[in-house]
């Protein structure tokens, strides 16, 4: 064995340079052990070289693979981060700002609408002034609630109480049917109330109701039945409210601005005596005020008292003490009825001549509730007048000539306890 290795040793010493270059540099040793170790290590060195050469490739591939996978993983990570919030799915929160502006800027009105279903349920009625009460997206309904809220200076609780009472009253009374009724006596109410509608140049309409207190022929006949008088008065008011066309509204009125759904009222006291207060008038007037204050809030734009004696100025001065400024600012006493049309320059020609305009008298062109002629009432009235004349003649004959004539009671005594409070 040693001979063989001795024979091979010179061959390794004289090996070509190319063979040495292909392998690891050989360490030349004088001992056989080093040579044997070198010979044994050379194949391993080649394997290691091959392995070493292959490993970078694998590592490079792994590195490239890792580099390629990292963007993919990065792409997946943001997607996973964006999914949890799901902001688009939280629709209820996003829809809250879409609340109508008139509710967003008026929390009291918003609260009032929240109470509306309970109000309608407790009253058992869902109609006001010809407007079916719906939700906050319905302009006519919004306008109705605004009026009740304004009448109570923004107090939701008070507005709720008033609306509830008004709805219950409408359910019990059915004022719309009263306006269409034809059972009102012409003898009792003929010539006492009228309705006119005047048009502005821009097409806007002004509704005016006229109460001619001087037209009362017999106090007891007109005011004797208080309930009948109130029904007639409500019927006239309902006709005027219908002319406002609130159910046709397409826009919401400005809570703090002008309200186009209001009317003008004129109370004419021509030929009315203010010397004494008749109990029948007082009772009928008081009841009318109660009904109108509750059931017709914020429907009055202005109220004119015409042909009022100058001495009655104290009445209006006293009223300012008990009523709010918002109410009294709407009252305008005018001693001469012929000056009324001056208050409406753009409508002056449409007013009756007796009130300073150019139009015919109210009896000729104005509207009123349907009246029926009562044949028996006039006969009774004529008989009572004839009897009164006989009694008066008998008294004249029995009086001494020197005795002064006793003053007769004026039958046309009409004093409204609080005339300005007819409609708030």
From Swiss-Prot:
Question: Disordered: where is this region?
Answer: 1-98, 372-424
Q: Domain CRAL-TRIO spans what residues? A: 188-363
Q: How does it sit in the membrane?
A: Peripheral membrane protein
Cite the binding residues for heme: 213, 233, 267, 269, 303
Molecular function GO labels: metal ion binding; phosphatidylinositol transfer activity
Q: Which CDD domains match?
A: SEC14
Keyword Transport assigned: yes
User: Cofactors per UniProt?
Assistant: heme b
Which SUPFAM superfamilies does the annotation name?
CRAL/TRIO domain, CRAL/TRIO N-terminal domain
| Bias (Polar residues) | 1-16, 50-68
Q: Which reaction does it catalyse?
A: a 1,2-diacyl-sn-glycero-3-phospho-(1D-myo-inositol)(in) = a 1,2-diacyl-sn-glycero-3-phospho-(1D-myo-inositol)(out)
An individual GO BP term: regulation of exocytosis
Q: Gene3D superfamilies from the xrefs?
A: CRAL-TRIO lipid binding domain
Please give the superkingdom of this protein's source: Eukaryota
Q: What does the entry list under GO cellular component?
A: cortical endoplasmic reticulum; cytosol; endoplasmic reticulum membrane; plasma membrane
* Residue ranges with Basic and acidic residues bias: 383-411
Q: Which key words tag this protein in UniProt?
A: Cytoplasm, Endoplasmic reticulum, Heme, Iron, Lipid transport, Membrane, Metal-binding, Microsome, Transport
Where can this protein be found? Cytoplasm; Endoplasmic reticulum membrane; Microsome membrane
Q: Which family does it belong to?
A: Belongs to the SFH5 family.
Q: What PANTHER family does UniProt report for this protein, alphabetically?
A: PHOSPHATIDYLINOSITOL TRANSFER PROTEIN SFH5 (PTHR47669:SF1)
Report the function annotation for this chain: Non-classical phosphatidylinositol (PtdIns) transfer protein (PITP), which exhibits PtdIns-binding/transfer activity in the absence of detectable PtdCho-binding/transfer activity. Regulates PtdIns(4,5)P2 homeostasis at the plasma membrane. Heme-binding protein that may play a role in organic oxidant-induced stress responses.
Q: What is this protein called?
A: Phosphatidylinositol transfer protein sfh5
Query: Gene behind this chain?
Result: sfh5
């Amino acid at each position: 064995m040693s001979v063989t290795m001795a024979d091979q040793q010179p061959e390794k010493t004289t090996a070509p340079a190319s063979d040495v270059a292909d392998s690891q540099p050989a360490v030349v040793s004088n001992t056989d052990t080093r040579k044997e170790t070198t010979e044994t290590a050379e194949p391993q060195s080649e394997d290691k070289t091959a392995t070493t050469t292959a490993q970078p490739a694998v590592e490079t591939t792994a590195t490239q693979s890792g580099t390629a996978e990292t963007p993919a993983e990065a792409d997946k990570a943001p997607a996973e981060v964006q999914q949890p919030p799901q902001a688009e799915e939280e629709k209820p929160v996003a829809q809250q700002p879409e609340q109508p502006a008139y509710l967003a800027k008026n929390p009291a009105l918003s609260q009032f609408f929240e109470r509306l279903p309970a109000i309608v349920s407790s009253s058992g009625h869902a109609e006001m002034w010809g407007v079916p009460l719906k939700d906050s997206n319905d302009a006519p309904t919004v306008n109705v609630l605004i009026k009740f809220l304004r009448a109570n200076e923004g107090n939701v609780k008070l507005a709720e109480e008033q609306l509830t009472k008004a709805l219950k009253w409408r359910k019990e009374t059915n004022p719309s049917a009263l306006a269409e009724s034809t059972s009102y006596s012409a003898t009792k109410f003929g010539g006492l109330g009228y309705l006119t509608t005047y048009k502005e140049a821009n097409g806007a309409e002004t509704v005016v109701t006229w109460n001619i207190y001087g037209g009362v022929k017999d106090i007891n006949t007109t005011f004797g039945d208080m309930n009948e008088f109130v029904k007639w008065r409500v019927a006239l008011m309902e006709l005027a409210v219908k002319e406002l066309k609130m159910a046709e509204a397409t826009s919401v009125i400005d809570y703090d601005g002008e309200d186009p759904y209001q009317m003008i009222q004129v109370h004419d006291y021509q030929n009315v005596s203010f010397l004494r207060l008749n109990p029948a008038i007082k009772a009928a007037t008081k009841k009318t005020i109660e009904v109108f204050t509750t059931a017709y809030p914020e429907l009055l734009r202005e109220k004119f008292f015409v042909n009022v004696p100058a001495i009655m100025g104290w009445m209006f001065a006293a009223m300012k003490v008990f009523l709010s400024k918002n109410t009294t600012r709407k009252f305008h006493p005018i001693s001469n009825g012929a000056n009324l049309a001056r208050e409406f320059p753009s409508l002056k020609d449409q007013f009756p001549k007796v009130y300073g305009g150019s139009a015919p008298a109210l009896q000729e062109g104005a509207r009123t509730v349907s009246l029926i002629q009562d044949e028996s009432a006039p006969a009774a009235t004529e008989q009572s007048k004839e009897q009164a004349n006989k009694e008066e003649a008998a008294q004249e004959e029995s009086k001494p000539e020197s005795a002064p004539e006793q003053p007769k009671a004026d039958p046309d005594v009409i004093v409204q306890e609080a005339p300005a409070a007819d409609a708030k």
